[in-house]
Regions:
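Short, glycine-rich nucleotide/cofactor-binding loops
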Residues: 9-10
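Radical SAM/AdoMet-radical enzyme domain recognition
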Residues: 1-4
Length: 171
């Protein structure tokens, strides 16, 4: 799940949304991640003249997400929508999302993915490790009977290592 920041909502509305997500997690325990995305106007849309999300609002919302949401929820922000994606790590994200050296960002095709080597350098300089993962997070992949349909359990096992991350030697 996630929230889009900077479309005219208030800070209190963003906080309330994060609190609702936290409550859902406490009740069901099924939220892998919360994507916090900054609004950027797009040509050809009804909001093309709306100003982009101020960076301060975006960074503050990520920090609030880290404070409000339970620790087991990963916080994600797209690195290609920020001029300085290092800041995203410093305020609380722990996941870059579906960054690909092969495909474009299908949601924001006008914003290319950053170079993976640069993303790795920035990530490591902030004390983190850039590790490939499946679309399912490791803690969910490690508990297949609870979280994954038996129809896809075997492919998940085949594609993940013993920690639940993507195998470096996929079969």
């Amino acid at each position: 799940t996630g929230i889009l920041v900077g479309m005219g909502e208030s800070k209190s509305s963003r906080i309330e949304s994060l609190k609702v997500i936290a409550e859902i997690q406490k009740t069901f325990g099924n939220i892998q991640e919360v994507i916090v995305q900054n609004f950027l106007p797009k040509v050809g849309t009804a909001m093309h003249k709306h100003p982009p999300c101020p960076e301060s609002d975006f960074l503050e919302t990520i920090a609030l997400a880290r404070i409000i949401l339970p620790k087991e929820i990963h916080i994600q922000a797209p690195p290609n929508l920020s001029d300085d994606f290092r800041k995203l790590l410093t305020v609380g994200i722990d996941d870059w999302g579906g960054v690909s050296p092969v495909t474009k960002d299908h949601v924001n095709p006008e914003r290319p993915w950053p170079d993976l080597e640069k993303l790795k350098q920035v990530t490591e300089s902030e004390g983190f490790e850039l590790v490939p993962r499946l679309t399912i997070y490791p803690e969910f992949a490690s508990n297949l009977k609870k979280w994954v349909s038996s129809d896809v359990s075997f492919p998940v096992m085949e594609l993940s290592d013993s920690s639940g991350y993507a195998r470096s030697d996929p079969l």
